[in-house]
Amino acid sequence: MDGSWLSSEAIEVSKTRLNRTGYFETVDVTTENVGATDDTVSVNTKVKERPTGSISGGIGIGTDSGLTIQASISQNNLFGWGTRANITSYENDYRKHMEIGYTDPYFTVDNVSLGGRLYLDKYDGDDDEDVVDYTNHTCGATFNLGYPISETWFVNYNLGIEKSKIKNNGTRFEQSDVFFNMYSKDPTRSVNFLDYKLGFDITHNSLDKGVFPTSGNKQTVSLTATTPNSDMHYYKATAETYHYFPIDLYHEYVFTVRGRIGYGNGYRSKNGVREILPFFDNFSLGGSEWMRGFSRNSIGPRALYKYPIIDAYYESSTSVGGNAFWTATAEFVIPTPLVAEAYKSSVRSAVFFDAGALWDTRSKMYTVDYSDPGKYRTSVGFALTWMSPMGPLSFNIAKAIKKYDGDDTQQFNFNIGSSF
């Protein structure tokens, strides 16, 4: 503010705030004397803008799942107001997903945020495609309201409505039989569910940058539950943490650790039996973010299919997810070779180690016991991300180290897009 005392601490806070937006590649703040006296200075801020909009696409290659295609259009600084908008789609042989979202993080002068999203998801499984054999068509809407409670703490509330249409395709499996029997529904016919969801999350963020942070930490705790007037009654809770430790003075070498845990279950009884987290809303593990080296949604408890003649189930190689998980990652960020000084702020290279487990605590309900949290997977690899003038481009090369029969491994994954 004009006429106020100069504070080096306040200058650093302002610089960090600008970096956290993710809108700028570099932020430099300098001071210079004003006029003939040396008791008045001017604070000057020089920034190099980063492209905040993107049109991107991605291709994943898996040993069993084949090609996965995704595309998105997003703008994180719409009209220069700091608002965020996106259109995202994801498609493979058995799933189609599309969503539209909009958030205004500066809805009021006190930084209260307001936003929402609409989504449509169609899952058409087929046991010949090595995915769980059922159909689930879902559409819904979510509205959120958030506000800061301090410089580094932020609270967000959300309200959602979701309609689902579910049925077995023909090959019965035990997880779906248990679910449909609980609600006295015929699994061979389409069943409709209407659920209202309430959510809450709290975030602490002391990272130095919004893109490619090199120091600080970030934690988020989230809870989502269906309301008592919904057709199903369950909750899901997650917690995640990120930590960045610079090794050298220039933050070219950075050690990073991150972790995530989750748990979900039912909270009421139906026909004398406690409800469960629906099998189609289970947690999943595998993919380019948390468990590299394994294809998306490819590890964890398996679908237990029913023999066509006898009244018994057998274990398949198809993952159906679980109601509890943990993941942990260690990364060592290193300078990228052959990159000019002018582009170093836009490129990040790292070697990584990923580990994680996905299990089901409701072992007494099923023929096979999947309740062991110690049945984990691990992988190692190299990751490269470039915020190029043509858009974000990332590569992951990974090797699954500890794996189990039926796991769908993915040695290579890349995403490419164009920015505006």
Description of each model-found segment:
Residues D104, F245, I334, S388-G391:
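Hydrophobic alpha-helix-in-membranes signature
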